[in-house]
Amino acid sequence: MAKNKKQNGKAKTPPVVAAAAGEQKETIGNGHAEQNGLNGHASSEESDPAAAGPNESADDKSAGVAGGGETEQQQQQQEDDVMRLMQETGFTVQVLSPGVEPLSIQVSSMELVQEIHQLLMDREDTCHRTCFSLQLDGRTLDNFAELKNIDGLQEGSVIRVVEEPYTMREARIHVRHVRDLLKSLDPADAYNGVDCSSLTFLHTITMGDIMEKKKTRQESVDCTPPDFIMPGARERPLLPLQPGTGKKGTPQPLKVLTTSAWNPPPGPRKLHGDLMYLYVVTMEDKRLHISACSRGFYVNQSTDDAFNPQPANPSYLSHSLIDLLSQISATFRRCFAQMQKKRTQRHPFERVATPYQVYTWTAPALEHTIDAIRAEDTFSSKLGYEEHIPGQTRDWNEELQTTRELPRATLPERLLRERAIFKVHSDFVTAATRGAMAVIDGNVMPINPGEDAKTQMFIWNNIFFSLGFDVRDHYKELGGDAAAFVAPRNDLHGVRVYSAVDVEGLYTLGTVVIDYRGYRVTAQSIIPGILEREQDQSVVYGSIDFGKTVLSHPKYLELLNAAGKHLKILPHSVYNDKEEAIELCSSVECKGIIGNDGRHYILDLLRTFPPDVNFLALPAEEEAVGKESRAMGFPIEHRHKLCCLRQELLEAFVENRYLMFMKHAAVQLQQCVKMKQEQKAAAAQKTEEGGKQAAIEAAAPAEGDKTPAKDAKDGKEAGKDANDGKEEGSTTKEAAAAAAAARSVPKPDSEDAKKLVESLISSDQKNESMEVVKRACEAVGSLKEYEFNIRFNPDVYSPGIRHVDEEPNAAGSLRRQKQLVKDAAEFLVKHQIPSFVHECLDHTSAPMDGVTLTELLHNRGINVRYLGKVVDQLAKIKQLEYLHTIAVSELIVRAAKHLFTAYLQQTDVMSMAAAISHFLNCFLTVSTGGYQPVANGTGADGDGQLADEFGPKAGGKKQNKQSKRGGGGGGGKGAAGGGRKATFSVPSSDNCEWTALTSKTLWAQIRQELKAYWDFELTVEQPAKEGKESKAAVIDSIEPLIGAFKLQKISLLRSFCLKTGVQILLQEYAFEQRNRPAFTDADIVNVFPVVKHINPRASDAYNFYTTGQTKIQQGYLQDGYGLISEALNLLNNVYGAMHPENAQCLRMLARLSYIMGDPQEALAIQQRAVLMSERVNGVDHPYTISEYGHLALYCFANSQITTALKLLYRARYLATIVCGENHPDIALMDSNISLILHAVGEYELSLRFLEHALALNIRYYGEKSLKVAVSYHLVARTQSCMGDFRSALVNEKETYAIYKQQLGENHEKTQESSECLRHLTQQAVVLQKKMNYANGKLLSTGLPPIHIQPPSMGSVLDMLNAINGIIFVQISSKEIANFKNEIEKRQKEAGAQSQQPGGGPVQANQEEVDQMLMETMQKTAAGIPFEEQDGEKKDGAAEAASHTAGGAAANTAAPAVSPRRKS
């Protein structure tokens, strides 16, 4: 970030231009939906060099590295910083603990003493100690000191572990630690969503650590897939989602460990050193009371009814509770040792806490055990000692702001600062989530208890909580409760971008938005002093009454202007109620408050970005939307007026306008020069107009009719020209053409751009060039006359705001400002949506579920409220049928979520489980009557009986009638929630409207919601009967939609649970049963909060990562690997071991290791990536599924065939749960599975998967695509191995036909296929002869066996690599020969001794070879290289050159890096 600032400061061009895209790298990726580059999933290396966006060249991706001399120096400086940091590396020290062998550990000088402390608490032999100090030469080391600052600490130093006396706090920490050790193997915390633990099943699937497995031989492979994995399987079982849950875990070491009821120690015992008492029941049923004193733990003589604190006989005093329990109970000793062994065998990534809590939507039935510490955790009184810092609670605001103030000049400082920001932020999110749940559960006292429940506010643990309702009619003008519900989310977007811009001296509040049990809670840190005075006294900037009284403040203007340059916010003036003009640089409702700590805070950032006119009802004279938008049915009046455009859209729009500006100016300047040369004064005017015309036409495909329409009315030449030159139509072809055109023009802040503008201004024809710039500015709607300046006024359409507009015809007039906001909205509809659809056609980053789809839309700046329009576009394209299904499911689930929110608010807490199960029944099955309680035979259903005893008397006829009258209408308003109850903690117990809900009423509401919110008509055509027209089917349940949109109930259930926080019981659900509901109240296990927050970034790591990506795109794999490894080190430094970005980085490193010829290293790294993705993204997240696929490939390359198949089966199973079988990724998985099955001789199974993959490839890529050719070839290959040469010939002919058509007759692939056809024909002839011979002569003995050579593992691996898009570098034999000659020639020139041919690749200068490889890679034919060759592969480039039999293309490893090993 700092680097980018320096860079932008040097710009000589207008400052806005300089800021236009440089900061984009920093700000864009901070959202909740993680962005491109490091955060996104399809990294550029895997998709396409231009993945950074249509206009971003590979050089720009390197975060300014290729910018110019000074930037390169900065980059070098930064790399030197890192190297220096990494060189301060390790040395070894000895640690001596009492009663344990001395331990040697490698430490880094940057580490804190506390990290050694933590290491000892994790190790098997020392984990039972918590209360100890570390001493060096008799001096106690400070826990928070860095090792490099400790005198006398060096290589070989001996650190002693010294047991310290306990205090009350230390004793409690020790007991908690012991309890954590005893339940460390218990997955209950992960299911219950506590303590940042989450699930992982990788080692259950692979049966242990992959790296420790032996290679499997072909004969010993068990590879039959379960039935539900097979293509075309109907059922989607839920139990395999969490394998191994039914197995019995480790034996229990203790029955009970809890604090004793004799606590606290009475006065006399305190004076004897007693700190607390514990109660233990051992497995042998001994009941013991234990005293904790300052010297340790001992058994006392108390019983359940008599207090006797004297030590028992025989007395043991142990410093560690574990030692004492091992003395008392032999079972404990044995079981604890077993547990420890198991615990330390687990991969560290299975144990480390995640930064944010990940919840799981299914859980098995868990046994509820006695646990006093858990009980104590639920009460907020324990806040004091849970935070291991002095004082009762943490001052969150002070911590959050102090970390931002840390210095950031050097790399080590920035790392320290970012680590501190991240740590405090993740702690704050955890605390805020707990607090919000406590508020809704009714466990926190409001600060205004006398008021109505909706208007109550809360403070807990120094965090302020408010509810998402329109209190005191604050949002009355903007949409009431609907606006109040959306405002916190918009405010969070504002906090996100201002934190990302990171202007020194400008502070935002810690903000978390939590949706829990139907309520939206906003948690914020508290500005010092704000509670001591009224709001209108504290606000020094902005307005508290939506623009009636407006204040400004010079310091705020300065700070917000600095941020506004990056965020494209325009400084503007408005009138207050005294008719004074007040200058602002934000929306009116953004408030500035100077806290008691002297810091400048901004809050209420709900309108940071300009409004979206496509969803505003504006007065008719405004002509709000363009032609294109009107054709699509806009404007749609939304239920609130807080619809804003996304930051990503504004970035794209500005970049697009800048392109137009540069083309316009360049064309006109050429015209000027030409005119001067020809000295034809008379024709000058015409030439200029012609040039102008040409420029507009050049920009038209990218831009369309976005020139200000009003200019034309004013009769301005430029406006006329612009409108004449516009082209209609928003076809995807145009979008593609625009993207192509865009690549040739420099970016707004690139060096070329600056030079171009400078040359315009400083050229000889000063006046002409000024005129050129002026016209270009006018054509693109710039707000300055002689400068490219596109910024947005967020208040242009705010009701009740009066703008100062002194010069209505000036460049920066209000009319121009409004036009820009309209143009941006039009740009979204006309350009972004079509180009999104067009981009989806190549299926490179095919989303699998609503979450990944939303992420893709957000990256393009498309809000989810446009999803209805996106669905309409997708419906027209057959190849995107799968995406249409995903988008429709997302719409339906979101509509259901809106209704569910209101539904839960009307539900009494005691009926919560019953109400949720009833809603799911109405949503996913056909439920005709209202709620029917189901008596479960199991004893577990106590709550079901409770609900019947006290809850809604659904059986009573009278009541049912009443509720039927009231039901159905309540949820119609969705998030705005019609008819909400006045209280939220416990609604009155006769509140049972929910029981009247039926499938029919729910689906009527869902359709209503889809129309109102997304303008989407949910209709299904009934097939026409003879002689009758087809008519729309009645949608009164989900059933008609399943076939029409190819929806899948299990996918809808998963999506709904993840969005609403509902956790259901892990079991099979019978959706089709008519006589019994699919869900009962016993199936609803829990409701979790859904948490939204910002994601602080590791900016230096991000820059290293993007630079690494650029190197890889340029072909410098080794350099790229180094940079990305460095990025991973920095990420670990900032985020700790667990984070989605770390997983991203690991995946990239694994792929690079593999491409560079080290499959074993790739396997080790990818295993970590899978574990991490399961832990931080979720076990069934699409990212995790793709990680499984990569791991399977690397397993196969390491000859772990069984494991590879298990992993692919897992990936395929998860994908079918998430999105069903109709998806491009399934085609790839099926091809992979079939190839491996083919390798182990399971030809029939292999063929089933292959045929399915072929069908999908034809559907998505068209019948004549190269992918389909490969599929046909694979089918033919398998059929030939089965002896079915006739079918094989038919399929191989298809391959040949495609290659001939696409690549030409002389292409290597076509000739290979032709060779294959000849081979198959021969085989078929031989077979026929054998059969004739057998029929004639040897009827009695039957057919002789057909000898078919099975494929070698090497050729299968090559094929796997090819279909997974891993190209080692495909070089034809001829090219290899040339390549060798070229290297030899260069070496001879350099006077080096050349190697003998055939001795493997010739050594050459790394850079030269990389350069040549890059050239050959660029020559790679149309993308799908493969080798069809059943002999063993030869190794190395030189041998491949000589190996031309059958004309096969050799997939050689990039020779300079290292040749691929033989498999």
From Swiss-Prot:
Basic residues bias locations: 955-964
Primary localisation category: cytoplasm
CDD domains in the cross-refs: CLU-central
Biased composition (Low complexity): 10-22, 692-702, 1438-1456
Protein transport recorded as keyword: no
Chain spans, region Disordered: 1-79, 684-753, 942-988, 1387-1463
MF terms (GO), sorted A to Z: mRNA binding
Residue ranges annotated for the Clu domain, each copy included: 374-616
GO process terms (BP): intracellular distribution of mitochondria; mitochondrion organization
Record keywords, A-Z: Cytoplasm
Paired cysteines (S-S): none
Compartments reported by the entry: Cytoplasm
Compositional bias per record (Basic and acidic residues), positions renumbered to this chain: 703-731
Compositionally skewed regions (Gly residues) per UniProt: 965-980
SUPFAM superfamilies assigned to the protein according to its UniProt record, in alphabetical order: Hypothetical protein c14orf129, hspc210, TPR-like
Cytoplasm as UniProt keyword: yes
Gene Ontology, cellular component aspect: cytoplasm
Family that this chain belongs to: Belongs to the CLU family.
Physiological role: mRNA-binding protein involved in proper cytoplasmic distribution of mitochondria.
Protein name: Clustered mitochondria protein homolog
Species the sequence originates in: Anopheles gambiae
